[in-house]
């Protein structure tokens, strides 16, 4: 009674408690129905939100018991892929992030990819620009400029495949210069 009196400012009654319980069950049922409707149309982002809201109302309510394991699994995999995208972006693995993003877009018709796509494209372009500047510095014999631009490219996108290409070219150049000696 202290919870109701201090928190809500009213004395609990059987009718009030019954009304609150019925409202919670109605809300959970409505959210589960919304979840299933979104799932039917492959709107996984919205479906995951409705399912989360339904669980927040009450995990053990009867309406939530109607959600099958297969339906929960679809949402779990969607959330895991979303988390994998965030992790790939955090470690600046933009090639992997791009693959995960494409997978999410194919799986969910309501996934908003614009922010992630913009960030991936920008960071890839910045890294590639630094690589291009490094190559220009190398052509002009500016070793310090080459090293600085390569460092910048690596900081922006450490797994840029063009960095491997530069390493291969440098190895070939070094091998050829050793043969000439």
Segments (PLM) and residue ranges:
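Amphipathic alpha-helical assembly segments used for oligomerization, scaffolding, or translocation
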Residues: 1-181
């Amino acid at each position: 009674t202290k919870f109701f009196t201090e928190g809500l400012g009213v004395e609990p009654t059987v009718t009030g408690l019954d009304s609150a319980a019925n409202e919670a069950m109605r809300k959970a049922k409505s959210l589960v129905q919304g979840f299933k409707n979104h799932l039917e149309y492959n709107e996984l982002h919205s479906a995951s939100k409705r399912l989360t809201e339904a669980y927040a109302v009450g995990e053990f309510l009867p309406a939530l018991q109607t959600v099958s394991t297969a339906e929960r699994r679809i949402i779990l995999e969607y959330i895991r892929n979303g988390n994998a995208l965030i992790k790939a972006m955090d470690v600046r693995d933009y090639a992997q992030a791009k693959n995960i993003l494409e997978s999410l877009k194919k799986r969910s018709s309501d996934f908003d990819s614009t922010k992630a796509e913009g960030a991936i494209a920008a960071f890839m372009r910045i890294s590639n620009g630094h690589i291009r500047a490094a190559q220009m510095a190398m052509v002009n014999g500016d070793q310090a400029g080459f090293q600085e631009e390569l460092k910048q490219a690596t900081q922006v996108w450490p797994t840029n495949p063009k960095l491997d290409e530069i390493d291969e070219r440098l190895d070939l150049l070094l091998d050829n210069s050793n043969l000439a000696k």
